[in-house]
Structure formats: C-alpha cells, structure tokens
Curated annotation (Swiss-Prot):
<dbReference type="GO" id="GO:0005743">
    <property type="term" value="C:mitochondrial inner membrane"/>
</dbReference>
<dbReference type="GO" id="GO:0005524">
    <property type="term" value="F:ATP binding"/>
</dbReference>
<dbReference type="GO" id="GO:0061629">
    <property type="term" value="F:RNA polymerase II-specific DNA-binding transcription factor binding"/>
</dbReference>
<comment type="function">
    <text>Implicated in mitochondrial protein import and macromolecular assembly. May facilitate the correct folding of imported proteins. May also prevent misfolding and promote the refolding and proper assembly of unfolded polypeptides generated under stress conditions in the mitochondrial matrix.</text>
</comment>
<dbReference type="GO" id="GO:0007005">
    <property type="term" value="P:mitochondrion organization"/>
</dbReference>
<protein>
    <recommendedName>
        <fullName>Chaperonin homolog Hsp-60, mitochondrial</fullName>
    </recommendedName>
</protein>
<dbReference type="GO" id="GO:0034514">
    <property type="term" value="P:mitochondrial unfolded protein response"/>
</dbReference>
<dbReference type="GO" id="GO:0140662">
    <property type="term" value="F:ATP-dependent protein folding chaperone"/>
</dbReference>
<dbReference type="GO" id="GO:0009792">
    <property type="term" value="P:embryo development ending in birth or egg hatching"/>
</dbReference>
<dbReference type="GO" id="GO:0008637">
    <property type="term" value="P:apoptotic mitochondrial changes"/>
</dbReference>
<dbReference type="InterPro" id="IPR001844">
    <property type="entry name" value="Cpn60/GroEL"/>
</dbReference>
<dbReference type="InterPro" id="IPR027410">
    <property type="entry name" value="TCP-1-like_intermed_sf"/>
</dbReference>
<dbReference type="InterPro" id="IPR002423">
    <property type="entry name" value="Cpn60/GroEL/TCP-1"/>
</dbReference>
<dbReference type="GO" id="GO:0042026">
    <property type="term" value="P:protein refolding"/>
</dbReference>
<keyword id="KW-0067">ATP-binding</keyword>
<dbReference type="GO" id="GO:0006457">
    <property type="term" value="P:protein folding"/>
</dbReference>
<dbReference type="GO" id="GO:0005739">
    <property type="term" value="C:mitochondrion"/>
</dbReference>
Length: 568
C-alpha cells in the first residue's frame, strides 16, 4: 500500500463558483463609483483645452494621449462592483468609436449624466422601466432635431475643417486628410502609418502594390535602386508552384515571339524552372522576372483573382480552370503598362483588364465588406478594393520620438474617422452646441406618464453636459456660457473655448460630424438607461490562495521512502 506523508502540505478548499450578490441601491451605488471614476478620467481630455492623460504600459514608454477611447480602455478597477460600472461605460466609448470613429469622450460624458440621474430618480421611487422608456423616446426626438440642423459636407475646405477639429486644431493634419480624400475619393482607402521623418507626409500608391519582391537578384534590370522595371509587360499567374522546365517554356516562347517582357507571379518558382529563367535572363537577355504570390491560403487565392481581373490574365492551377500551364496561349496572359519590382515589393500599374469585370469585382468586394464583422477582414478587403479602384493614400506620421508619433497617430486616426462620418451624414455646430440646441425639440414634448417624463428630464439635463465639460476644461463657469448661448436665436451661435469668445460655429469652422454626435447620444442613452434599471449585481469572489508555498509543500515528499515497501 502506498502511503504518502502529508507533513508540511496544507491545502485550502477553493470554491471557484462562489459569487457575491448586491441588490438595489447598494449595487447601483457601487457601480456608480466606477462610472464616475472612468468618466472623470475621460472627460479631462474633452475640448480644445482638454488635458492629456499619461497611461502606464506593461511594456515600453508610458503612453501620452488625449484620445477618449484609449483612456477608457486603459482603466481596470480593483473593486469588482466599481469595475462593472466602469466596463459598461467603456462599452459605450468602444461602440461610439466603432460606429463613428470619434465622439467617445462625448458619449462617456452623456452616459455618466444619464446613469447618475437615472440612479437618483429610481432611488426616489421612480419606475425604472418607464424612466428608461422616457429616455429612449426623448433621444429619438433629439436625433430627429440633429438631422434638421445638419449641413452637408461637399467641398475640400469643409472636409479640412472637420479633420482639423478632430485632430485638436492641427491644420496640417486637416489639410493632409483633405488632400488624401481629394486623391482617392471620400470612400477610398486611407491608411495611417509611422513615418520616418519629423514631418507628416502623404503618399499615394496607385495600381496593385503588394509586399513580395523578385525571387532572385539576377532578374534586376536597374542597378540604381536594385529594381526590375519593365513597360508593356505580359503577366502569367499561377496558384501552384512552378518547378518543371516544361511548365514555363511555352510562356517564354510566347513572350519572345511577341517581344514583350514576362512577369511570372506564382505560389513559388524554384528548381529547374528558376534556373532556366535566370540563365535566359543572363545569357540571352530575355526580359523576365519571377515573383512569389502575396498572402496565404484563401487570401492569396483572392489576391491572385483580383490581379487576374485587373490585368486580364487567366489563373493557372485554379480549380475552375482546367487548362494546363504548358498549353498556354497569348489570350491567357495578362497585360500591364508598367511594372516595378524591388526585393521587398511589386507594383503593377495600369492593368489591361476588362473594365466591366473590374467593376463587377469591386461590387463583389464591397458586398463582402458590408457583410463582414471582423475589423481585420474589413481592413484587408478595403485594401483589395483600393487596389482595383483609385489606389491607397498613406498618411505617414512623423515626430521626434515614438511617444510623440503614437499620440499623433491616435489623433489622425480619430480625425480620419470623423471626416468620413461628416461626409456620410453631414455636420452640426460643434463644441456641444448641437446637443444644447436640440433641447428646444423637447420643450413642448409631453411624455405618456409621469415616470416617462422623468426620463425626458434626465435627457434634457444630460444634453447640457458636453458643453459644460468643454467650458469647465477651459477654466470657466459653465452656467453663464450656457445662458448666453441659449439666449441667442442663431442655432449655430456658440462658445469658442480655444479663443475664449462667442462665435457662429459654422463660420468659425467649429463643427462636429452629425453621425458622431448622434451615435454618442444613442449609445450613451442605451447603455446608461439600461444600467439604471439594474436591481441585482452578481460578481465572482476572488479565489483563495493555497496556504503555504510550493517549496514548503515539498517537505512532505520525504514520505516517498515508503515506496520501497511496495510489492507486486
């Protein structure tokens, strides 16, 4: 019989399913502490005179940011109940960011105001469900009013204004985004990347560019820059690896006969096939180059199909194409006006594909983007779409340090999203004025019952909070500013917190995209009013640690000496 000595081993029973439960006002109050903590941290960034927040990171330098959603995401509270409240408001910021790309700080401020007032009304005996209904009905009325005061954005100047506001008054960024949209269109692909200089730059990548270069340096035609450059080239596409000589000889003969350069893009080119290509290039002077197809799996298959449609080439090795590569004809080869290949990337310019087929492919990819739920997938689909249409605009963000570039990239990404939103649904006066002006729509609104009217009053109070926060961050008393703004009949009259004066917000270029304000209000009211209807909060009790460390427990292993007594 095996007997283990237990000396030194002390265990604690761990009930992983143990929960802690709080009801009513106690649970809501605990969550409200978390809501307030997160909202306080986020609201300091609001407006032109908002402050920065420094966030400790588990790796690298601390992050300095004025981006609301970044601040919200960084907050994780020790107290479980407080953390639940904070996480729900985080969701509001995330949702606003996903839908409109901006307005996260505004959404957070609104959510806190609605949750706080909602909790108080319920504490005083209001019906939570009816109050929520009143909040949602009031929000519908306000959204309709926002659409009424909204103006369309059409000119490059207006686009630059929107981008400048979202980039915290950075006119360079505003003009850069406006130029990018001018070049690739308002629905074109614009990406934001780290630059390699101190200045911000705009680069337009036309045609089909992908990150795969020549397979062998022996294909180089231009010593300067170690590039392969050809004009009026033929394109051979293959989904499969090309290794045999007989696979490429017919294509080489065709290219030679037509006196045109040949670009081979395949899964890989190696063995005898690669040797033959290199020898023909060096000894005969044949204009040829081989490139590995970009991506993997379905991504590679789709990219090759895009190339085939853009250049008019047949894809060999494709399941739908039964023709063998050795039976190639001139009609199976695609055409491009220019091709430039370095060791790292390839650029195909002005493919000669059928325009009708290209448009069909663009429609197909657009449908896929609409149906996709993955951000990564959407990004890849947008890149493919851009390569088939107007190209990709790349905003290269410069700066003196990694921290500076990171902070600027956050602002540029926000500005880009806000600008797209403005083009989509128009603009309203900025600085919290649009929401304040929407109060007039609720002036004569009568709710179905007393509790719903409480919900309407909660929204009325919340609508004053964004402008109040902006003014407070500028170091002024909000009530006098709000009275001055509401006392003027001009709907675009508001307060310029940056320069400390009252102006016509549209004329001064202080504007917000309608979509940003609308989504901020809808997301905030939805989550915050639901939070107010909470009657029970359940959290996990942290697991107890085993008493005595692993080293102490090992002392009991001395009993293993009894193993000698085991008989079989």
């Amino acid at each position: 019989m095996l007997r283990l000595a237990r000396k030194g081993l002390q265990t604690a029973v761990v009930r992983s399913y143990a929960k802690d439960v709080k009801f009513g006002a106690e649970g809501r109050q605990a969550m409200l502490v978390g809501v307030n903590l997160l909202a306080d941290a986020v609201s300091v960034t609001m407006g032109p005179k908002g402050r920065n927040v420094i966030i400790e990171q588990s790796w690298g330098s601390p992050k300095i940011t004025k981006d609301g959603v970044t601040v919200a995401k960084s907050i994780d509270l020790k107290d479980k109940y407080q953390n639940l409240g904070a996480k729900l408001i985080q969701d509001v910021a995330n949702k606003a960011n996903e839908e409109a790309g901006d307005g996260t700080t505004c959404a957070t401020v609104l959510a806190r105001a609605i949750a706080k007032e909602g909790f108080e009304s319920i504490r005083q005996g209001g019906n939570a469900v009816e109050i929520r209904r009143g909040v949602m009905n009031a929000v519908e009325v306000v959204v309709a009013e926002l659409k009424k005061i909204s103006k369309k954005v059409t000119t490059p100047e207006e686009i630059a204004q929107v981008a400048t506001i979202s980039a915290n008054g950075d006119t360079v960024v505003g003009n850069l985004i406006s130029d990018a949209m001018k070049k690739v269109g308002t629905t074109g692909v614009i990406t934001v990347k780290d630059g390699k200089t101190l200045n911000d730059e705009l680069e337009l990548i036309e045609g089909m560019k992908f990150d795969r270069g020549y397979i062998s340096p022996y294909f180089i035609t231009s010593a300067k820059g170690a590039k392969v450059e050809y004009e009026k080239a033929l394109v051979l596409l293959s989904e499969k690896k090309i290794s045999q000589v007989q696979d490429i000889v017919p294509a080489l003969e065709l290219a030679n006969k037509l006196r045109r350069p040949l670009v081979i893009i395949a899964e890989d080119v190696d063995g005898e096939a690669l040797t033959t290509l290199v020898l023909n290039r060096l000894k005969v002077g044949l204009q040829v180059v081989a490139i590995k197809a970009p991506g993997f799996g379905d991504n590679r298959k789709n990219t090759l199909k895009d190339m085939g449609i853009a250049t008019g080439a047949t894809i060999f090795g494709d399941d739908s194409n039964l023709i063998k590569i050795e039976d190639i004809t001139a009609n199976d080869l695609g055409e491009v006006d220019e091709v430039t290949i370095t060791k790292d990337d390839t650029l195909l310019l002005r493919g000669r594909g059928d325009q009708t087929e290209i448009e069909k492919r663009i429609e197909h990819i657009t449908d896929e983007i609409e149906q996709s739920t993955s951000d990564y997938e959407k990004e890849k689909l947008n890149e493919r779409l851009a390569k088939l249409s107007k190209g990709v605009a790349v905003l290269k963000i410069g700066g003196g340090s990694e921290v500076e570039v990171g902070e600027k990239k956050d602002r540029v990404t926000d500005a880009l999203c806000a600008t797209r939103a403005a083009v989509e649904e128009g603009i309203v006066p900025g600085g919290g004025v649009a929401l304040l002006r929407s109060l007039t729509a609720l002036k004569n609104y009568k709710a179905a019952n007393e509790d719903q009217q409480i919900g309407v009053n909660i929204v009325k109070k919340a609508l004053t909070q964004p402008i109040a926060t902006i003014v407070k961050n500028a170091g002024l008393e909000p009530s006098s500013i709000i009275d001055e703004v509401t006392g003027n009949s001009n709907t675009s009259y508001g307060y310029d917190a940056l320069n400390g004066k009252f102006v016509d917000m549209f004329e001064a270029g202080i504007i917000d995209p309608t979509k940003v304000v609308r989504t901020a209000l809808q997301d905030a009211s939805g989550v915050a009013s639901l939070l107010a209807t909470t009657e029970c909060v359940v959290t996990e009790i942290p697991k107890e640690e085993a008493v005595g460390g692993p080293a102490g427990g090992m002392g009991g292993m001395g009993g293993m000496g009894g193993m000698g007594g085991m008989g079989f």
